[in-house]
């Protein structure tokens, strides 16, 4: 009877060791994806969001007691989140200017900033497709889909595909719909 209990205990111990060893080999592979995640939201860092409000205070640190350095005054402006702390997100704009903004002022709606003057929107993701509209540099457009080298934009009642390389607010390898 003693030997039977010892065998069961040994088999259980062996199984537990195998599980621990497997986990130790699997975990580094997951960690090596190169994508950092926020400690608050567990979402990728950096990531793009947009201004939900038409005006938002940008603070030096993540609390109301920190000084306001400036005010973002453009609804739907794309911003890149670079850090998280409680209800605060450290963001930066296209020019690298930024600070801490309360999360309630931000939206997950994807927008981009046009970086090329008279950027043409095409009917299909093809440079030879019919041109639907042209957007001036600095225009903010909503993004509904991105794949490969093109993104589907909506702005001023127009809809069309634009080359991803001419936009700020999406990563080069990013795809979504």
Tell where the protein language model's regions lie, with residue ranges.
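Second-shell loop/turn segments in exported
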Residues: 62-66
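SH3-family beta-barrel domains
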Residues: 31-60, 71-75, 82-85, 89-97, ...
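Bacterial N-terminal signal peptides that target proteins for export
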Residues: 2-17
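Extracytoplasmic entry segments of secretory-pathway proteins
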Residues: 12, 28-31
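C-terminal segment of classical bacterial N-terminal signal peptides
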Residues: 19-28
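Short amphipathic alpha-helical segments with coiled-coil-like heptad repeat character
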Residues: 2, 67-68, 99
């Amino acid at each position: 009877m003693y030997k039977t209990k010892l065998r069961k205990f040994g088999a259980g111990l062996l199984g537990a060791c195998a599980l621990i060893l497997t986990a130790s080999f699997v975990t580094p592979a997951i960690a090596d994806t190169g994508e950092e995640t926020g400690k608050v939201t567990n979402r990728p860092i950096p990531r793009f969001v947009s201004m939900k409000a038409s005006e938002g205070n940008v603070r030096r640190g993540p609390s109301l007691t920190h000084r306001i350095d400036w005010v973002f005054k453009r609804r739907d402006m794309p911003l890149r989140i670079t850090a998280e702390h409680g209800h605060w997100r450290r963001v930066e704009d296209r020019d690298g200017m930024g600070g801490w903004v309360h999360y309630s002022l931000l939206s997950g709606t994807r927008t981009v900033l046009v970086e090329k003057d008279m950027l043409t929107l095409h009917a299909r993701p093809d440079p030879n497709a019919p041109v639907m509209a042209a957007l001036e540099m600095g225009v903010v457009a909503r993004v509904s889909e991105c794949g490969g080298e093109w993104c589907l934009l909506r702005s001023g009642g127009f809809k069309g595909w634009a080359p991803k390389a001419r936009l700020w607010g999406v990563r080069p390898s990013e795809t979504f719909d």
